[in-house]
Design a protein with these regions (language model features):
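Catalytic-site microenvironment of enzymes
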Residues: 1-292
């Protein structure tokens, strides 16, 4: 449910939590190609007007009061945060079954060269009880066209699957959250506002809710995942989830799949340039909430 469930993401929540050991990126463009991103103020004015928001003011410790030997290790204290909840009037919002939680919007500072662009960052999994609840695989109720954690032909999938477990016992949700926090900090430092779809160990937002919020508040959506299932004990590389051919004529996919795949390709190429291992050709076509 894209404009659809979660925008392009590095791999999805309903997804393939059991296929290959490496980080997956599902990157999905919601409204326009990357170079056509709308300013954050316009997005918020047009789309967030109806959503419930709460301002959370946190007080940062003045840097001059922090001992010199520990100043460099102090975590960043963010202020002027907004909690964004699911607006029932948004398209596809009625397909969500778990939606009492909230995403958190982090504004970039003016000192960072604020760009007025909102990047949705989705730390995969992390919704207690999500595996016991079912949501539609596609907005129109049609069946899945590929396999994954939910088999091809199914019309419903777990609202949020539990994810994989690393060989040392660490659950995927913990790793994706830390990844999301690192990505958030880097994006904020570069002037991008960041919409954290999951900002803590647990958020009561299913894959549909996360995607719909992102569709209406962010310029693009990046979901972070890891895969396993083949018994490998090494990192096989990064890839993004591309849109299966069979979905490219179904709305809202038809209006967005090209932007989705373009962003995914750009993300993988950026990782390649930084020396990250890339799996195969850098993409895998899977029918997920974000890609349908």
């Amino acid at each position: 449910q894209k404009n659809t469930d979660e925008s392009t993401s590095v791999a999805e929540d309903t997804a393939i939590a059991e296929e290959q050991s490496r980080v997956t990126l599902t990157a999905e463009r919601e409204t326009a190609a990357t170079e056509e991103l709308q300013p954050r103020d316009q997005i918020m004015e047009e789309s967030v007007g109806n959503c419930e928001t709460k301002t959370s003011e946190e007080t940062a410790v003045p840097q001059d009061e922090v001992p010199a030997e520990t100043a460099q290790s102090q975590p960043v204290e963010y202020t002027d945060l907004q909690q964004i909840t699911l607006d029932s009037t948004w398209e596809y919002a009625d397909h969500s079954k778990i939606n009492t939680g909230a995403a958190v919007l982090y504004p970039a500072s003016e000192e960072s060269g604020r760009k007025g662009i909102v990047i949705g960052v989705n730390a995969g999994h992390g919704t207690s009880g999500g595996a016991k609840v079912k949501t539609l695989c596609h907005p129109d109720g049609s069946a899945k066209v590929t396999g994954g954690s939910t088999a091809a032909g199914a019309t419903e999938a777990a609202a949020v699957s539990g994810g994989m477990t690393f060989q040392d016992g660490t659950p995927e949700r913990e790793v994706t959250l830390r990844m999301a926090q690192i990505l958030r900090d880097k994006l904020l430092a570069s002037g991008y506002d960041v919409l954290m779809l999951r900002d803590s160990e647990d958020v009561q937002l299913d894959n549909v809710a996360r995607t719909v919020i992102c569709n209406n508040v962010a310029n693009c959506h990046i979901a972070l995942h890891w895969d396993s299932g083949d018994g490998k004990n090494y990192d096989k590389g990064c890839f993004y989830i591309s849109v299966p051919e069979a979905l490219k004529t179904m709305e809202p996919v038809a209006s967005h799949w090209q932007q989705h795949d373009t962003l995914g390709t750009d993300l993988v190429e950026g990782l390649r340039e930084q020396g990250a291992m890339i799996y195969g050709k850098g993409n895998m076509s899977i029918d997920l909430t974000q890609t349908s």
